A protein has these predicted regions:
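Hydrophobic ligand-binding cavity/cleft-lining segments
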Residues: 1-49
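Intrinsic-disorder/low-complexity, polar/charged segments enriched in Ser/Thr/Lys/Arg/Asp/Glu/Gln
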Residues: 6-12, 49, 67-69, 93-95, ...
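Generic structural detector for well-ordered beta-strands
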Residues: 12-16, 43, 71-73, 82, ...
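Short strand-connecting beta-turns/loops that link adjacent beta-strands
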Residues: 18, 47, 77, 103-106
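Hydrophobic pocket/interface hotspot
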Residues: 22-26, 32, 50, 72, ...
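Hydrophobic/aromatic beta-strand elements that line small-molecule binding cavities or substrate pockets
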Residues: 39-40, 66-74, 94-102
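Glycine-rich portal/gate segments that line the openings of hydrophobic small-molecule binding cavities
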Residues: 44-89, 143-156
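Beta-strand/loop substructures that line and gate deep hydrophobic ligand-binding cavities in soluble
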Residues: 86-139
Length: 156
């Protein structure tokens, strides 16, 4: 039996770095991923596709590992980086986008993430596992944003 957890997150923040510098990091998946916490391995699948293998986490007496793959596309003129899930890779489907806007004195960054995580748990565990999985993912994304903000010279 399995439990499916849906995750929808949105963030907006400003950094001191120039938009071109921000785009260069966020459009380079390995560079961007180096700021994401608890990544065990990032595997280049070719053609702009990457498989993310997260560190294993323990919840109660259960050990879980999130693995997913996404295909990335970027458009420098529009200041966008987006990714779509690759089905059949791992136990999650993750899509999202970055929108980078040059506001002269600062760079505005908007991050949106939609995910669906399938956990190998009995249905009765959903009430316990879903909020923990959501909170853990949200905590990692917030740490990722903090790490990127620091890399980009702090908040503007």
């Amino acid at each position: 039996m399995a439990v499916t957890v849906e995750i929808n997150l949105g963030y907006e923040f400003d950094v001191k770095a120039k938009a071109s510098e921000v785009f260069a990091v966020l459009s380079d998946v390995p560079s961007s991923a180096s700021h994401f916490p608890k990544v065990d391995q990032l595997v280049d699948l070719g053609g702009g596709a990457y498989r993310w293998e997260m560190e294993k986490i323990g919840i109660a007496s259960i050990t879980l590992q999130t693995v997913y793959a996404s295909k990335y596309t970027s458009n420098k003129a529009k200041g966008t980086v987006s990714w779509t899930p690759i089905k059949g890779e791992g136990n999650a489907l993750v899509a999202g986008s970055w929108k980078i806007t040059d506001n002269k004195k600062a760079t505005n960054i908007v991050l949106e993430i939609q995910g669906e995580l399938t956990l190998p748990l009995p249905g009765l565990m959903k009430m316990v596992a879903a909020p923990i999985a959501e909170a853990e993912f949200e905590k990692m994304v917030e740490q990722y944003i903090d790490n990127l903000t620091e890399h980009f010279g702090g908040e503007a």
